[in-house]
């Protein structure tokens, strides 16, 4: 069950995509969105060597960085207010009253390293939603990697453009590995809601008892999920590109895979 969704924001372009996806998921599961705005300490925005420039100039640089930090937080808050309002999210409640059939949300702000803060916060969430620009941002990319490897929680990478639904036609990239199995287990709420899934495997997959996609299909049938199996030909492509391409060809809107 998905009840809490952590949606980190930074005041940059990916915020709208990340929050939009988080609220779509929240609507699907009547869940709570925990929007967390993380901005660097002013000293990190304006790295300076104290001995290299006069103190008044150093203070001015930190002041400018502080102003930029405030602008970033205000920008992220504006996007949050717009999207949460569009989805009719109510302020969060606690205790038994929090278990409801409506979307709730709250807003928090903190300063520090995105890649350090988000994995720790993620451990107290059911799902993390992050987005990045098509060209990628180094800070966000680092946060994505640390969430995958250090949080112990599933990560949903939001599409860069606007979408009206997500998880209605899921696919699983299956190779029988432990990380793939954990991804499937974490995605069961999506799979049960959809009731169907495409199982993808590649012609380069290593043989193994659990790697057989038919075995996964049998497991999912116990959860009431209808499956179809599709082979993705790698050829000269990266495995990830082959899987993504095959999922798109099958009309899927969510690809589930291990990190």
Task: Show where each model-derived region lies.
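Small/aliphatic-rich secondary-structure junction motif
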Residues: 1-60, 150, 165-233
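Amphipathic coiled-coil/heptad-repeat helices and related helical stalk/stem segments
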Residues: 18, 114, 140-141, 180-183, ...
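Gly/Ser-rich helix-loop-strand patches that form or flank binding pockets
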Residues: 19, 26-28, 115-163, 246-259
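Structural beta-alpha unit
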Residues: 40-43, 51, 78-128, 223-255, ...
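A short acidic, glycine-rich active-site loop
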Residues: 57-74
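Electropositive phosphate-/nucleotide-binding environments in soluble metabolic enzymes
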Residues: 70, 74, 112, 181, ...
